[in-house]
Design a protein with these regions (language model features):
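A short acidic, amphipathic alpha-helical/loop segment
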Residues: 5-9, 107-110, 180-183
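Repeat-solenoid scaffold signature
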Residues: 1-19, 23-27, 218-219, 223, ...
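C-terminal amphipathic helix plus adjacent low-complexity
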Residues: 95-97, 110, 123-143, 226-279
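Conserved catalytic-core segment of nucleotide-activated headgroup transferases in glycan assembly
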Residues: 62-156, 162-164
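Acidic, amphipathic alpha-helical patches
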Residues: 6, 156-159, 181, 204
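Active-site-proximal region of nucleotide-activated glycan assembly enzymes
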Residues: 12-77
Length: 279
């Protein structure tokens, strides 16, 4: 149901067993799609199917494997947090602004008000035009925020290097970031994510767990705000994360291509065996 999808092809069932997953976080609604790829954090076994027509195909670890170096030449290295030199904390969000709810903007407002002199960089396609930037500023102002603390940046191909300007990334909810969260961690920037009750709202928790930083997961809005403020005020911890995260992420489950493929292929074997038994 997203742009340029292949649902008409899937509806013709070109394969005897069909799976949807990664990139699209909801059900297809097609009975021809048998499974939905997920994991034990995004869709725990204790949960029901939650409206999915597909059977959950759960991997024991994150159902996403992040392999940026196969697509980009940039290499991440540890560095000091920007706040160490600037003297103030810069929060950031590089997600699509369509994911930013009023409820989340209010939390960002509260975080900025609790951290003196802090700024928020919002980088997205809508900020590529003056009318889009004005909409963002007016919306933030309507919710009680000070638009002067916002730095609005347009989408650009060098977005990875721009993480070097960010101290802490604030994830969106209930539609979490996926690739943007991975990118931030890879570039050494901690991400505060809120765990919800659906696959799409638990994506951030799955990624952060796989990256080895589950302490950055918040279970409610108050904790989300609290974790962001506490980290912003703990310069030693913030700087340590910036210096150590790149190597930690490269050695984590999130980027373990071999381990990921072993788990995925085992899942394939199980559902194929089941198909053959039922065939």
């Amino acid at each position: 149901h997203s742009q340029n999808n292949c649902l008409p092809v899937m509806a013709c069932r070109p394969a005897p067993v069909q799976i949807s997953g990664i990139g699209y976080i909801n059900t297809t609604g097609l009975p021809m799609v048998d499974y939905f790829l997920t994991d034990e954090i995004c869709m725990p076994s204790v949960y029901d199917k939650g409206g999915f027509t597909e059977t959950p195909l759960r991997l024991p670890h994150c159902h996403l494997c992040y392999q940026p170096e196969t697509m980009r030449e940039i290499k991440s290295v540890g560095h000091n947090a920007p706040a160490m030199e600037r003297g103030y904390v810069t929060f950031g969000s590089f997600n699509s602004f369509a994911k930013v709810t009023d409820e989340m903007l209010v939390q960002w407002r509260n975080i900025l008000q609790a951290v003196p002199n802090s700024k928020l960089v919002i980088k997205c396609k809508i900020c590529s035009v003056p009318s889009g930037q004005e909409m963002v500023r007016q919306r933030f102002k309507r919710l009680g925020g000070n638009p002067d603390v916002l730095e609005l940046r347009p989408f650009s191909p060098d977005y990875l290097t721009q993480y070097g300007d960010i101290d802490i990334v604030l994830d969106t909810a209930p539609y979490n970031g996926g690739l943007t969260t991975c990118d931030a961690l890879y570039m050494g920037v901690p991400v505060i994510a809120l765990r919800g009750k659906t696959h799409g709202s638990r994506y951030g928790a799955s990624i952060l767990t796989a990256a080895g930083v589950p302490e950055l997961i918040a279970e409610n809005l108050r904790e989300y705000t609290g974790k962001a403020v506490q980290l912003a005020k703990n310069g030693m911890l913030l700087n340590r994360l910036h210096r150590e995260l790149p190597e930690q992420v490269r050695n984590s489950r999130l980027m373990d291509g071999k381990g990921y493929m072993q788990e995925l292929e085992e899942a394939y074997r199980q559902i194929w065996a089941l198909y053959c038994q039922q065939g």
